[in-house]
Curated annotation (Swiss-Prot):
This is AP-5 complex subunit sigma-1. As part of AP-5, a probable fifth adaptor protein complex it may be involved in endosomal transport. It is a peripheral membrane protein. Probably part of the adaptor protein complex 5 (AP-5) a tetramer composed of AP5B1, AP5M1, AP5S1 and AP5Z1. Interacts with ZFYVE26 and SPG11. GO terms for biological process: double-strand break repair via homologous recombination; endosomal transport; protein transport; vesicle-mediated transport. GO terms for cellular component: AP-5 adaptor complex; AP-type membrane coat adaptor complex; cytosol; late endosome; late endosome membrane; lysosomal membrane; lysosome. Coiled coil: none annotated. Its main location: cytoplasm. The keyword DNA repair applies. It is found in: Cytoplasm, Cytosol; Late endosome membrane; Lysosome membrane. It comes from the Eukaryota. Keywords: Cytoplasm, DNA damage, DNA repair, Endosome, Lysosome, Membrane, Protein transport, Transport. InterPro entries: AP-5_subunit_s1.
Length: 170
């Protein structure tokens, strides 16, 4: 089961930018109560609790994306959006999956599948037993459809790829 879908900002590694990761959109499917208190909280407190959980996932995705880009040998200039006539390729975009232990930040263990495109992070929070191949294809399809709808993948409007392309000399 998918527990959440989120879109958030990604920053390039090695930049002086001290801005925080921002969640641009999130949708949580199902409710999870605060782990320390079985009694019912107000709707506002539950909303803030879910917001904190989603922000924790977004920060971990951003951290892993930056780590993957640095490990690939990308410099900060390689990760800046470039003006280009080439369409953005979703197959070259950084992606991955990681496991969240119970209590960090959800009560149950979860798997997070993520994709980084054009300084945006897309993530699905899943049950640990979900089919990751199917979930990855679904996430790529969602990202492509959203970016197509916003006209971010077309060469005329695109600000370029915000992910590292391997240098031939490396």
């Amino acid at each position: 089961m998918v527990h959440a879908f989120l879109i958030h900002t990604l920053r390039a590694p090695n930049l002086e930018d001290t801005g925080l990761c921002r969640v641009l959109y999130s949708c949580v499917f199902g409710a999870e109560k605060s782990p320390d208190d079985p009694r019912s909280h107000g709707a506002e407190r539950d909303r803030l609790f879910r917001k904190e959980q989603i922000l924790a996932v977004a920060r971990q995705v951003e951290s892993l994306c930056r780590l993957q880009q640095q490990a690939a040998g990308c410099s900060s200039t390689d990760l800046q959006p470039q003006f280009s006539a080439e369409p953005v390729s979703l197959h070259e975009a950084p992606h991955g999956a990681f496991h969240l232990a119970a209590g960090d930040p959800f009560q149950e263990p979860r798997t997070v599948l993520w994709l980084g495109i054009l300084s945006l992070g897309f993530a699905l929070v899943l049950d640990t037993h979900e089919n990751l191949l199917l979930a990855e294809r679904t996430l790529r399809l969602l990202a492509r459809l959203l970016l197509d709808h916003l006209r971010l993948l077309t060469p005329a409007v695109s600000t370029g790829a915000a992910y590292c392309r391997a240098h031939p000399s490396r």
